[in-house]
Regions:
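S-adenosylmethionine
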Residues: 144, 178-288
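Conserved SAM/SAH cofactor-binding pocket of Class I
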Residues: 121, 125-206
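Conserved beta-strand segments that form the floor/walls of ligand-binding pockets within enzyme
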Residues: 3, 98, 116-118, 153, ...
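Conserved beta-strand segments of alpha/beta enzyme cores
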Residues: 27, 65, 98, 172, ...
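A short, charged helix-loop
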Residues: 109-119
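N-terminal auxiliary segments of SAM/dcSAM-dependent transferases
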Residues: 1-109
Length: 289
């Protein structure tokens, strides 16, 4: 197994992370190296990833340090140790969420909704801060008196947010993703978790968003979840034909939130209701109410 690692300045992390997710949508390991440097790593079998000597390179205009190493034959056990169960505690009146990989034991708590996600299939297992923050906001949203209703998950990845929404009673739920692997993974995960989710392959930059036209969408107040990176969220703000009732946006570095909130506010009239931060990452809840 090959481990391809890229070290980058924290302020340039977004660009590198986006490129690595294109290379390996199955997941990216994040290692903090002090205050100013972060390392991202992806794993693949020989031939799946380039095996490179240590070098200085560039992603666009961003300087990075790249290294490629072979890791021992017990890589699968190491990979499993990297993916641990995640418990998302709820507000009052809403069940907790327990997200686990299939090799971990179920929760012994009676008050949880359990979600089983295979981290080897697509990005998004609940372990990364951006996914976790979106799950926290989704629980808050599910506790509103007039929720849940229809939900659109843009960039569904492994389907963890769409599955959580279905577990919490949102319906219908539609997941969109550009990657074939993500569409297949979400369908598989929905079956494993016993929920009904529609999944479509979709290109945000080339196709019109479904469900935002009243003639096309389901009845009820639409919730949109978009755990994307900043450039795609700005594209989403420009491309939405009308505002949803609620929007949960993740995948942001904490210093990018104001720009994204401003874009959705200026274009669609959405306003910030709540912001969550974990380390350098952030997610935000915008409302049209």
């Amino acid at each position: 197994m090959i481990r391809l690692a890229v070290r980058v300045r924290r302020e340039d992390a977004e660009v590198v992370l986006a490129e690595l997710l294109e290379l390996a949508p199955g997941g990216v390991e994040e290692v903090q190296l002090g205050e100013e440097v972060v390392e991202y790593a992806v794993y693949g079998a020989p031939g799946e990833l380039p095996q490179l000597p240590a070098l200085d390179a560039a992603v666009g205009d961003t300087p990075v340090q790249v290294s490629s190493t072979e890791i021992p034959d017990d890589w699968s056990e190491r990979w499993k140790r990297f993916h641990r169960p995640v418990l998302i505690e709820p507000p009052r009146g809403v069940p907790a969420l327990y997200v686990r990989p299939p090799w971990e034991a179920p929760s012994d708590r009676d008050d949880v909704k359990e979600i089983v996600i295979d981290p080897g299939q697509a990005f998004g297992t609940g372990s990364h801060a951006t996914t976790r923050l979106c799950l926290e906001l989704l629980l808050e949203l599910a506790g509103l008196e007039d929720a849940p209703g229809p939900l659109l998950d843009i960039g569904t990845g492994s389907g963890v947010l769409a599955i959580a929404a279905a577990q919490l009673g949102f319906a219908p739920v539609l997941g969109l993703d550009h990657e074939r692997e993500s569409v297949a993974a979400t369908r598989d995960s929905a079956t494993v978790n016993g929920v009904t989710i529609e999944v479509r392959r979709f290109d945000l930059r080339k196709q019109a968003l479904p469900w935002l036209d009243e003639a096309d969408g389901p009845s009820g107040s639409l919730v949109v979840v978009a755990n994307l990176l900043r450039p795609l969220l700005l594209d989403l703000a420009r491309g939405m034909p009308c505002a949803p009732s609620q929007l949960l946006a993740g995948g942001l570095l904490r210093d990018q939130v104001d720009e994204v909130v401003g874009a959705f506010g200026e274009r669609l009239g959405l306003r910030e209701r709540e912001r969550r931060v974990s380390g350098e990452w952030a997610a935000v809840w915008l409302t049209n109410a």
